[in-house]
Amino acid sequence: MDDQPTPQHTRPEGVSDETVEAVGKLSAALDHIEDARGHLYAFHRLMGSAESTLEEATELVRDAGHTDLADALDRDALGANPLPGMWSFQMVDEFDDGFYARAKGLHQRAVDELMGGRRHVFEAEMKELRRTRDGREGHEATPAEVTDDPEYDG
């Protein structure tokens, strides 16, 4: 074991601390955007479930003899856009094709132009500062150091 990070997680020659920090912060921002995108997808899935459940509820209300309320549910809720002109799938499409695509593209540009295509250099350097180098389990530099160990049973 050479106990070193892999080359794709090391700082390219001549890259400043400030640049590593800036790209690390940009990566953190993209992480938040990815989380927001996940919540948007969760919203989309919940709205789909809500639509199906609302359809069932409308029929049950109708079957229970409450035609006026069932008609109002049919007219004013079932199939209605949660936002003007859009169902949740359209919100996802707009987000993915708009802001998300631009943010992801700009992040990739920063990684390519400023870090020579190397991702997570800021985090890799943080790991190197914090981990021990005494062979302690759980402090290996790379997964290969674990999977190459004869005692590894994964």
Located regions from the model:
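C-terminal-biased regions
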Residues: 1-62, 67-154
